[in-house]
C-alpha cells in the first residue's frame, strides 16, 4: 500500500493540448471532512483505506492541496441533450487531476467533481452539493457490486461551503475513478467544430490508451467503433436486467468504454414499470426505462456520425446494426440466469415477456420477485409468489409453463439452484428512499447511515444478518420521490 504522497501522476490527456482541455486549479471547500469512503475503490490506487480518516486526505480531496505532478484539467466536449445538439459543454464543475498507475499495471483517471468553476461552467458555480455527491458515490459502488460496468467513487468530502440550488445547501466533492473520462461528446465536439486534425489525434489517443488490440486490425477505427457498440449493448442489457434507470442518457454522459457514467436523477425500479421515468425533468419520457434500449442505439448513431471523417458511412451503418442483436443476446442470457435456467430455448423470450407484463399489471417488486423465485423449488416458489399478483389465473398459467421449463432444464439439485440464482439475483439494491434517508442524516452531520448503506450495497447478493430492513419493499412515500437534474 502507498502513502498519499506516494501517488504518481501521468497526464497523457493533458498532453493532447489546450484544444482538448483547460488548466484549472481546484477551489477548496471550507472545513473539509470525510463523509464516506470506498475501501475497494481506494485499493485500485493502492491506498490504505485507513488514510481516508486523516485530515491530509480530506484536504487533498477537498481541493486544499495538490500533488506536485498532478495537472488538473477541465475537459471540453459537446453533446446531444434530450435529442438536441449543444455545441459546447465540458467539465463545468469537475477536474481531471491526472492518471495514476497501480501495482497491477492499471491506469485510473482521478476526477474531482465539485472542484469549482471552469471555463465550461456556463453560469454555474462549479460546485456539487452533498445530496447529489452521496447519490453518485452510492450508485457507482452499488452498480460495481452488481457487476454492472461503472465509474467508481473513492470518497465524498463534505464541507461548510454554502451553495444555492432550490434552497441553500452545502458543497461537497466526489473523487471519481475511471479508466477514461472520454465521452461520445468529445468526438462530437471536434466533428461539429470541423477540426479533423484534433479529431484524429483524439482517435489515436483512444486507440493507443484503451483499444490497443484494434491497432492490429486492417481498419483500427472501425474495430474501435465495433468495440464501443458491443460494450454499450452489454451495458444497457445489464441496466435492463437489473432494473436500473439512468435518467439522463445524453451523449455527453455516454462513455467510450461502455461504463455507467454521470449519475444524476437515476433510480432502480421498485415495482416493475416498463414506462418508469426517474427524472422529474424528463417531461416527454425520452429516457424512460423502456426507452433506454433505443436511446442507446440513437446515441451510438450520433457517435457514428462524428466518426465519419475516420470511417466509411457504410461500415459505420453495418456496425451500428449489430447493437440490437448484441443487446438481445446479452439481455436474454442474463434473464435466463435470473430465472434459474442453465440452457436456452426459443420460447424463453416469450416466457419472460409474459412474466414482465404480469408484473407490470400487478405492481410486483422487481428485485424481490427474482430473489424469492430462487428461495425454494420452482413449484414452491410459484405457489408462494402467486398472492403478489392481481391476475392470479394469468400467473398460475405462467407458473405452469415456468415449472415445466425448469424441469426440462434438468438442473434438479435445489441447493445448487438456490446458490446459482442467488448469485445473480440481489437481495439489496439502492432504492431511492434508502438513499434519501442516508442523505437526510448526512445533511444533519450524521454520516453513519450513508456508511452503513454503502457497506450493505457492497455485498448485494449475500444475506446480511441484522440488515433485513434494507431488503424490504419501500414505504408508500418512498415510491414517489421526485429526483431532478439539480446537483
Swiss-Prot record:
Mg(2+) binds at residues 253, 262. The active site is at 252 (proton acceptor). Keywords: ATP-binding, Magnesium, Manganese, Metal-binding, Nucleotide-binding, Nucleotidyltransferase, Transferase. ATP binds at residues 90, 92-93, 113, 125-126, 176, 183, 262. Disulfide bonds: none annotated. It holds the Pfam family SelO. It catalyses: L-seryl-[protein] + ATP = 3-O-(5'-adenylyl)-L-seryl-[protein] + diphosphate; L-threonyl-[protein] + ATP = 3-O-(5'-adenylyl)-L-threonyl-[protein] + diphosphate; L-tyrosyl-[protein] + ATP = O-(5'-adenylyl)-L-tyrosyl-[protein] + diphosphate; L-histidyl-[protein] + UTP = N(tele)-(5'-uridylyl)-L-histidyl-[protein] + diphosphate. Its cofactor is Mg(2+); Mn(2+). One of its GO terms (molecular function) is ATP binding. Transmembrane segments: none annotated. The keyword Magnesium applies. Its EC number is 2.7.7.-, 2.7.7.108. Belongs to the SELO family. PANTHER family: PROTEIN ADENYLYLTRANSFERASE SELO, MITOCHONDRIAL. HAMAP family: YdiU_SelO (MF_00692). Nucleotidyltransferase involved in the post-translational modification of proteins. It can catalyze the addition of adenosine monophosphate (AMP) or uridine monophosphate (UMP) to a protein, resulting in modifications known as AMPylation and UMPylation. This is Protein nucleotidyltransferase YdiU. It comes from Pseudomonas fluorescens (strain Pf0-1). The lineage of its organism: Bacteria, Pseudomonadati, Pseudomonadota, Gammaproteobacteria, Pseudomonadales.
